[in-house]
Amino acid sequence: MPAIGIDLGTTYSCVGVYQHGEVEIIANDQGNRTTPSYVAFTDSERLIGDPAKNQVAMNPRNTVFDAKRLIGRKYDDPKIAEDIKHWPFKVVSDGGKPKIGVEYKGESKRFAPEEISSMVLVKMKETAEAYLGESITDAVITVPAYFNDSQRQATKDAGHIAGLNVLRIINEPTAAALAYGLDKNLKGERNVLIFDLGGGTFDVSILTIDEGSLFEVRSTAGDTHLGGEDFDNRLVTHLAEEFKRKYKKDLRSNPRALRRLRTAAERAKRTLSSSTEATIEIDALFEGQDFYTKVSRARFEELCADLFRNTLQPVEKALNDAKMDKGQIHDIVLVGGSTRIPKVQSLLQEFFHGKNLNLSINPDEAVAYGAAVQAAILSGDQTGKIQDVLLVDVAPLSLGIETAGGVMTKLIERNCRIPCKQTKTFSTYSDNQPGVSIQVYEGERAMTKDNNALGTFDLSGIPPAPRGVPQIEVTFDLDANGILNVSAKEMSTGKAKNITIKNDKGRLSQAEIDRMVNEAEKYADEDEKQRQRITSRNALESYVFNVKQAVDQAPAGKLDEADKNSVLDKCNDTIRWLDSNTTAEKEEFDHKLEELTRHCSPIMTKMHQQGAGAGAGAGGPGANCGQQAGGFGGYSGPTVEEVD
């Protein structure tokens, strides 16, 4: 059973598999190699991917996207407050955690971001299963290199809820570097800068790639809240203000109008990557008012100027951390859809004094490609060019504990290789102190109050002693997923305690995860029921129209008028019933079909027999077959019926 690689993106996701020495990026059921990270809830069903994005203008309040911008964050995060202004769906606080409120099948539901992400992951898993023809459980999932511990852990939880065994969480730029290194058969030692600007996040990583097989990350930097969505927001704000200026109407109060404007803005943004001007035409955008306008590339660049410039700070930081200067970078590789923006490219090129940028890998698929390779390596595949691949990644943020006075004492420095383990000895702050509270933080600031709290645990039962005498050994163990385990041991008694950091404010408890796993199975069952319901409805519709067509087109003399009217009346009754019972259950459709078949079958059989009899008289036995085939009176579809 192969393992798959999934690029779980803010706006689009992508899945790949490594087999027969090659990576296949797998197209979904719509034939697209990337799938929108959208989940929609309606009165009757749940939609994921393309169908969800296609109906967003009709159902903006119950169509959820950008879950990656919520995952692993606290509700009071200022970034979330900023995003809520742009989202048509409702985000509420549930014990400090953000939850998404929607209406589903007439009921109000609340979903954690992990649940929404897990639904997208299920879609990617099903896409791979349909292609490979077998069930899949093992996967490697990518995250932005700058994701913190709680965001990584929450992504892993989403995989678990989706029924996946997450072999590894790997960093997106590292995965892209893997794709670049293997695809280009690099020779010698090369310093490669991966510039990854996607729909919602931005990463820069510098790697040294040796002979295309040793991938060593030297440094990483980024912004987990910068990407194409932010450029869209700027354009939408500009267009909404233009509409208000022209027509004295504020459409921002109307989610549907805003969504249609956003879709047009996104399309215009893409157009501006290849043209210098984009036209926006939206009929009856708001209160019957059409909106036609043009946006120039220069205007778009001006609207996003500060955001584009902000991409250069992490590049500088990554170079400093790697202790390299610009001239030591051999290749600058662009990844992520937003790197298609000409201004982003020209700023980066100027920063590197006119050096050519490498556009040779597919920016939408490179991350999933690398994830698929890593999945194959972790599941023991030793074939082809991946057999010698070794990947060495780094920690994106420093990790430490709070010591007296609120000082951040680092145990693991940022950009240290992972997995890694560090131990330091601490002592008590006051005489006869019976226990210590170990508070774990991540970040680069000197004081813990300015850093991100990951978790706390207490070590008690320390024997009475003067301050500074007890020896408490604290060990930080950062695993290959970038997830932290912390242990503390009092040396004289040997008392020890350890925790995997579970960010109490941002993380899901095991009980919540178990509940979500059960609910995910329930939703999958409901989706299956909905599919079966639609199949039954289609079977009934198709039978009604086929019978109606056959009777309508029956040659004169084959069917007497009474029988014909009887069939047509019954068919018309059924069509009326279908129109007024669109949400009927599968059993009702099946029952209607049975009833209709019982009524029409004898008449249809009689019609065929008459046709067959006439044929035998006219052209001997040989004509029977042909006559029978045409027995539906001009109906050209199949004339064989399955007998139950």
From Swiss-Prot:
Keyword Metal-binding: no
Any one GO biological process: response to heat
Region: Disordered, residue numbers: 610-644
Induction / repression: Heat shock induces the synthesis of seven proteins at five otherwise inactive sites in the polytene chromosomes of fruit fly larvae. Two separate sites, producing two and three copies, respectively, code for the 70 kDa protein.
Annotated keywords: ATP-binding, Nucleotide-binding, Stress response
Biased composition (Gly residues): 612-636
Gene3D superfamilies linked: 1.20.1270.10, 3.30.30.30, 3.30.420.40, Actin, Chain A, domain 4, Substrate Binding Domain Of DNAk, Chain A, domain 1
Miscellaneous note of the record: Most strains have three copies of the gene coding for this protein at chromosome locus 87C1; two tandemly repeated Hsp70 genes (Hsp70Bb and Hsp70Bc) and one in reverse orientation (Hsp70Ba). Some strains, including that sequenced in the Drosophila genome project have three tandemly repeated Hsp70 genes (Hsp70Bb, Hsp70Bbb and Hsp70Bc).
Identification of the protein by name: Major heat shock 70 kDa protein Ab
